[in-house]
């Protein structure tokens, strides 16, 4: 999601998103170095008049332009593979949240607790308070505790959706008849916004996601109050 006067990724709210940002910066530096090097060589070749009519085969230079790109790809691939395995690793989740995509809203079930399930609809612009975000706020937010491992089970009832929270580095497809899962760890309190990231029909743009991260003590109080 773009924000006003900002060309960077959103501020991280989870360790995995921090790793994604580090990898993005790492890859971008390598791409900038390659662009500068290739541009410098092309400009030099364009403006000089050196010609070698007898240079037909050069095993050394062929070896160099084969080995150097291979080493560069290794420097990109190794951190990428490490990050891919980290994103799929699941360590003893404290809470499991089931997310169900519908046309065009989300419903949530806290599977570890009784009688905690609700639908989450976007708040219409004419009903939106002045301090809320247009097309991003919902009537029922997801309440989750920070500094705890959270597991998300994602599915859909009609068409393919995608449950996405950029600041947590989470994007999971919601497929009818299939249960996908992911996990994340929220390391600070706050409100984090996301949207459906798979075109799913006429009102695809009106499927926001809002997570409110609170302390474990406040979360237990919320659970107790909601149960009654």
Curated annotation (Swiss-Prot):
Indicate what this protein is called per its UniProt record: Cytochrome c oxidase subunit 2
Q: How does it sit in the membrane?
A: Multi-pass membrane protein
Give the top-level enzyme category. translocase
Side of membrane Mitochondrial matrix, spans: 49-62
The catalytic activity of this protein is classed by the Enzyme Commission as: 7.1.1.9
Q: Which residues lie on this side of the membrane: Mitochondrial intermembrane?
A: 1-26, 83-228
Where is it located?
Answer: Mitochondrion inner membrane
CDD domains in the cross-refs: CcO_II_C
Q: Which reaction does it catalyse?
A: 4 Fe(II)-[cytochrome c] + O2 + 8 H(+)(in) = 4 Fe(III)-[cytochrome c] + 2 H2O + 4 H(+)(out)
**InterPro entries, alphabetized:** CcO_II (IPR045187), CcO_II-like_C (IPR002429), CcO_II_C (IPR034210), Copper_CuA (IPR001505), Cupredoxin (IPR008972), Cyt_c_oxidase_su2_TM_dom (IPR011759), Cyt_c_oxidase_su2_TM_sf (IPR036257)
Source taxonomy lineage? Answer: Eukaryota, Metazoa, Ecdysozoa, Arthropoda, Hexapoda
Q: Which PROSITE patterns match?
A: COX2 (PS00078), COX2_CUA (PS50857), COX2_TM (PS50999)
Tell me which residues bind Mg(2+). 198
State a single Gene Ontology molecular function.
cytochrome-c oxidase activity
What Pfam families does UniProt report for this protein, alphabetically?
Answer: COX2, COX2_TM
Q: Does the keyword Transmembrane helix apply?
A: yes
Instruction: Recite the UniProt keywords alphabetically.
Output: Copper, Electron transport, Magnesium, Membrane, Metal-binding, Mitochondrion, Mitochondrion inner membrane, Respiratory chain, Translocase, Transmembrane, Transmembrane helix, Transport
Free-text comment on the cofactor: Binds a dinuclear copper A center per subunit.
Binding of Cu cation A2 occurs at: 196, 198, 200, 204
């Amino acid at each position: 999601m773009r924000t006003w006067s900002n060309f960077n990724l959103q501020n991280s709210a989870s360790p995995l998103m921090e790793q994604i940002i580090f990898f993005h910066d790492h890859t971008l530096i390598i791409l900038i170095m390659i662009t500068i090097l290739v541009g410098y060589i092309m400009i030099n070749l364009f403006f000089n008049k050196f010609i070698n009519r007898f240079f037909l085969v050069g095993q050394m230079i062929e070896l160099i332009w084969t080995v150097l790109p291979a080493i560069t790809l290794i420097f990109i691939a190794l951190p990428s593979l490490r990050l891919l395995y980290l994103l799929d690793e699941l360590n003893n989740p404290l809470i499991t949240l089931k997310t169900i995509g519908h046309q065009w809203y989300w419903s949530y079930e806290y599977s570890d607790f009784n009688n905690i399930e609700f639908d989450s609809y976007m708040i219409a612009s004419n009903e939106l308070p002045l301090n809320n975000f247009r097309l991003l706020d919902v009537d029922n937010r997801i309440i989750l505790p920070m500094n705890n491992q959270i597991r998300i089970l994602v599915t859909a009832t009609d068409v393919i959706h995608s449950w996405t929270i950029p600041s947590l580095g989470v994007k999971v497809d919601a497929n009818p008849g299939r249960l996908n899962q992911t996990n994340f760890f929220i390391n600070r309190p706050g409100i984090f916004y996301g949207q459906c990231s798979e075109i799913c029909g006429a009102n695809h743009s009106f499927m926001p996601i809002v997570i409110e991260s609170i302390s474990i003590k406040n979360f237990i109080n919320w659970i107790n109050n909601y149960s009654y």
